[in-house]
């Protein structure tokens, strides 16, 4: 079945979650090879959940779910976070995007716990490796207590193949569990 023929509900949903300006929308653009999401240096550019159908190697027909930052503020920010929470309930894989130095990873840990409580696998993605050579990825890994943090640059495409491989591995594990039940 071609990706255009696969109903959206039957696709593998991959959610991108993180703080404002962590590069979620830029990652959507990098993964699709298209400018489908608006990006800027202004925090809070993504105001609504954006869905993008994509065919991923090793996964097949999928949907990328781009969300507003979970640290958004103010009255409108609260509404955007509510949409992000609703989107989180409908994903099959959560990518938690981080960048820069770990500045109190409480939000990231809380979101990871939320996903795990719902049996949703989590991949930590360190974005903007082009800005610091990835020197902070290990600090994030240790702070989060993660076995792995996939380092990427949405701007240059560095790490794209590793990210695709990591997502395909999670998909395979998820698919194996579904076949057993």
Residues covered by each model-derived region:
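Conserved G1/Walker A P-loop phosphate-binding module
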Residues: 1-78, 83-88, 174-181
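Hydrophobic beta-strand core positions in alpha/beta domains
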Residues: 16, 64, 97, 124-126, ...
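Short alpha-helical
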Residues: 22, 45, 103, 132, ...
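Solvent-exposed alpha-helical segments within well-ordered globular domains of core cellular machineries
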Residues: 29, 52, 62, 82-89, ...
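Hydrophobic aliphatic residues
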Residues: 31-32, 54, 71, 98, ...
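A short hydrophobic beta-strand->loop->alpha-helix junction that borders the nucleotide-binding pocket
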Residues: 41-42, 67-68, 99-100, 152-155
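Conserved Switch II/interswitch segment of TRAFAC-class P-loop GTPases
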Residues: 72-73, 88-109, 119-135, 155
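Canonical P-loop GTPase G-domain recognition
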Residues: 120-123, 128-181
